[in-house]
Amino acid sequence: MNHYLTPDLCDAYPDLVQVVEPMFSNFGGRDSFGGEIVTIKCFEDNSLVKEQVELKGQGKVLVVDGGGSLRRALLGDMLAEKAAKNGWEGLVIYGCIRDVDVIAQTDLGVQALASHPMKTDKRGIGDLNVAVTFAGVTFRPGEYVYADNNGVIVSPSPLKMPE
């Protein structure tokens, strides 16, 4: 597991990175995480999130555009534990999560807007690996995202921590 400091990455790569608007909170057991972007666009339906965390995710971060909904949780403890077991670096969720006490103990990075106790409907509706835009930034599959307690940044290519 790599440790990333977004302020240092911003200082080292000012022309490469885009800074996501500061609206996310860190809920995961990892203080920092980063990797190649895999995207999901969905609204109050986490069917695609469930499908993706079942797959191997080494070196990848699942970026979920949940439309900013504050009415349903797109991630809970069971899916977070599956994501960690399958090697995902983390998730950035433009929406809510639940089971926050368990997720805080899970070896997974999780950034989200808030917590909400209600689960989603499972209708199988959503899009996988499409460009998604929220918080002032467009997230494209195959680009890179890095997150820590300071914020979330996006880069078109992988970044190395400065020496």
Curated annotation (Swiss-Prot):
Q: What is its EC number?
A: 4.1.3.17, 4.1.1.112
Presence of keyword Lyase: yes
Query: Which GO MF terms does the UniProt record name?
Result: 4-hydroxy-4-methyl-2-oxoglutarate aldolase activity; metal ion binding; oxaloacetate decarboxylase activity; ribonuclease inhibitor activity
InterPro entries attached to this UniProt entry = RraA (IPR010203), RraA/RraA-like (IPR005493), RraA/RraA-like_sf (IPR036704)
Does the keyword section mention Cytoplasm? no
Note on how the cofactor is bound: Divalent metal cation.
Please give the superkingdom of this protein's source: Bacteria
Q: Which reaction does it catalyse?
A: 4-hydroxy-4-methyl-2-oxoglutarate = 2 pyruvate; oxaloacetate + H(+) = pyruvate + CO2
Give cofactor(s), names only.
a divalent metal cation
Q: Where does substrate bind?
A: 76-79, 98
Q: Which cysteines are joined by disulfide bonds?
A: none
Q: Where does a divalent metal cation bind?
A: 99
What family is this protein classified in? Belongs to the class II aldolase/RraA-like family.
Task: Please state what the protein is called.
Answer: Putative 4-hydroxy-4-methyl-2-oxoglutarate aldolase
